[in-house]
């Protein structure tokens, strides 16, 4: 993907990218997270998928049981959205999610403290992009 280096921007639509290209962005973002945010004793896997019609729209999700970050290419419209989704879901990977659903039922998604933390971490997208874009 290095040949795209000069053509790839945060505003580049994911519709213009192949799945392997998006996978590379996800992989480099996770590597950046491991270096800058830390990691657990077990790693995290990732995949780029198309979310079927009828599901609640989301840029991505973290599957705690499979230890996998999924990015949904049909809902993450730009490179920026992909990076933000990975930062958000990587934060969940780092969190203790044992009481996540219990807290969710009490306060809802928008006020959930772990979701708030993940949304704050999304703001690192610019710093992350500055570091990873040279590797793409």
Task: Go through each PLM region and give its residues.
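Non-catalytic terminal regions of proteins
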Residues: 9, 45-49
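Active-site scaffold of zinc-dependent metalloenzymes
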Residues: 49-80, 97
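Post-HEXXH active-site segment of zinc metalloproteases
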Residues: 80-84, 96-124, 131-134
């Amino acid at each position: 993907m290095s040949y795209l280096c000069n053509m790839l921007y945060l505003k580049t639509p994911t519709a213009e990218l192949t799945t392997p290209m998006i996978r590379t962005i996800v992989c480099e973002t996770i590597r950046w997270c491991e270096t800058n945010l830390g990691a657990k004793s077990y790693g995290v896997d990732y995949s780029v998928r198309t979310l079927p019609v009828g599901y609640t729209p989301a840029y991505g999700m973290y599957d705690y049981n499979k230890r996998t970050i999924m990015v949904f290419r049909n809902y993450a419209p730009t490179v920026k959205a992909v990076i933000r989704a990975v930062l958000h879901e990587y934060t969940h990977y780092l969190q203790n999610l044992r009481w996540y659903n219990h807290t969710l039922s009490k306060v809802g998604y928008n006020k959930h403290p772990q979701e708030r933390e993940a949304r704050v971490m999304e703001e690192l997208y610019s710093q992350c992009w500055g570091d990873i874009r040279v590797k793409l």
